[in-house]
């Protein structure tokens, strides 16, 4: 009698586990994780914005908004590159996303950027432009951020918890 009850329960348990695995796999199915279009404008190697230090293993993605509202992705990229001459600080990002959703890659993903202090050595950084002081992204910036982040997560086998 116990065997008759256990077999259907085992089948039900296996079905529920299978269903859970399928749902988890499809959790991000509606997100475009293809490589987004980007303009690669690598910074010159220098001690202030692109040290040329290789990242051993990417353990996460850090997202910031820029410190200068209303600026463009190109403005921010050029500022980072200009630090080699001004020496005013150490700052950079692997990617900058502009107000229109344009993406500029400033540093290769296998190299360290100066974006997040303690996590520079094991993360990829993304700076997002925003139009005003409230820091809210434009829809175009947000869409590009989602696609870029999804692509990087797929490329480096990262989870949402690592963003």
Question: What does each of the following model-derived ranges do?
Answer:
Residues 2-117:
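N-terminal catalytic cores of peptidoglycan-degrading enzymes
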Residues 90, 122-163:
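Long, well-ordered alpha-helical scaffolding segments within enzyme catalytic domains
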